[in-house]
């Protein structure tokens, strides 16, 4: 039997998503497999991550799947996209999004300017290996390695302050998933600092290299502040646009665009 699923395609600075309202999904769907099928760029719709959302009384719940069918704990760009979608569909400008137990406070300043307060970050979590272990690995591949630091912003990030070519970023990103370093994998951020801006590339756990990463931007900004490389406010520069970042009372606030690409119907065999 073939069923129909309504979807929305959006992107944040090139980091693209297929977004589906949970009410349009049958309880019989294998969501992990559905995510893999819809994310496939040749036989599906194509995206970096598959997003399911559900409206509750005073918040929206967001569930995130990677293209390999695994779940993700946070996605800053998807949060901005979902906030814009809710604004377009309801007119709401102040929107609370919950991802697991993480509360994200969103404000739609205008259609192309969405702010997300992602809360505080942590530099001390059980999953984080010692700096010496990470440094010993990273210095094998890096030229002009300045610093490495782990950040937890609801999902795990390793920030490497160094320059690395894209083909090498892929190699390093994959090798850093080694279980002896990161038992559950890690998002790897390659950051260069210049004139209080961070030029950022991210290898995302479960997705690979993407054109932008909102949570990576937040983690890299927080790391840059902690290390004294930048001050607040600052700008994170990606290939297809920038995010404005600031710190207020220990909270990280991300601001940037979200783009509606298409609305459509996906036909699924059950």
UniProtKB/Swiss-Prot annotation:
Catalytic residues (positions): 75 (proton donor), 213 (proton acceptor)
Keywords: Amino-acid biosynthesis, Cytoplasm, Isomerase, Lysine biosynthesis
InterPro entries linked: DAP_epimerase_AS, DAP_epimerase_DapF
Entry keyword annotation includes Amino-acid biosynthesis: yes
Site feature: Could be important to modulate the pK values of the two catalytic cysteine residues: 157, 204
Pathway: Amino-acid biosynthesis; L-lysine biosynthesis via DAP pathway; DL-2,6-diaminopimelate from LL-2,6-diaminopimelate: step 1/1
Binding site for substrate: 15, 49, 66, 76-77, 155, 187, 204-205, 214-215
Localization in the cell: Cytoplasm
SUPFAM superfamilies: Diaminopimelate epimerase-like
GO biological process: lysine biosynthetic process via diaminopimelate
CC per GO annotation: cytosol
GO molecular function: diaminopimelate epimerase activity
Lipoprotein as UniProt keyword: no
Reactions performed catalytically: (2S,6S)-2,6-diaminopimelate = meso-2,6-diaminopimelate
Enzyme Commission no: 5.1.1.7
Top-level EC class: isomerase
Pfam families attached to this UniProt entry: DAP_epimerase
Function: Catalyzes the stereoinversion of LL-2,6-diaminopimelate (L,L-DAP) to meso-diaminopimelate (meso-DAP), a precursor of L-lysine and an essential component of the bacterial peptidoglycan.
Subunit structure: Homodimer.
Family: Belongs to the diaminopimelate epimerase family.
Name of the protein: Diaminopimelate epimerase
Organism name: Rickettsia massiliae (strain Mtu5)
Gene assigned in the entry: dapF
């Amino acid at each position: 039997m073939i069923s129909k699923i309504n979807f929305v395609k959006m992107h944040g600075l090139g980091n693209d998503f297929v977004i589906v309202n949970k009410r349009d999904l049958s309880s019989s769907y294998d969501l992990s497999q559905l995510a893999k099928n819809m994310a496939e760029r040749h036989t599906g719709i194509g995206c970096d991550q598959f997003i399911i959302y559900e409206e509750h009384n005073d918040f929206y719940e967001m569930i995130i799947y990677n293209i390999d069918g695994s779940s993700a704990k946070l996605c800053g760009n998807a949060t901005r996209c979902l906030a814009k979608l809710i604004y377009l569909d309801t007119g709401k400008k102040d929107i609370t999004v919950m991802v697991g137990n993480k509360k994200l406070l969103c404000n739609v300043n205008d259609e192309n300017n969405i702010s997300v307060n992602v809360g505080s970050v942590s530099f001390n979590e059980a999953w984080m290996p010692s700096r010496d272990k990470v440094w010993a690995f990273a210095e094998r591949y890096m030229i002009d390695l300045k610093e490495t630091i782990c950040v937890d912003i609801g999902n795990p990030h390793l920030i490497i302050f160094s320059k690395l070519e894209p083909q090498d970023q892929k190699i390093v990103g994959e090798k850093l998933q080694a279980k002896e370093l990161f038992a559950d994998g890690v998002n790897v951020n390659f950051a260069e600092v210049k004139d209080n801006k961070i030029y950022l590339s991210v290898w995302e756990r479960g997705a690979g290299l993407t054109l932008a990463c909102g949570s990576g931007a937040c983690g890299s900004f927080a790391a840059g502040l902690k290390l004294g490389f930048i001050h607040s406010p600052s700008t994170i520069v990606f290939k297809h646009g920038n995010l404005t970042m600031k710190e207020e009372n220990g909270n990280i606030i991300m601001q940037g665009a979200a783009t509606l690409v298409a609305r459509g119907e996906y036909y699924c065999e059950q």
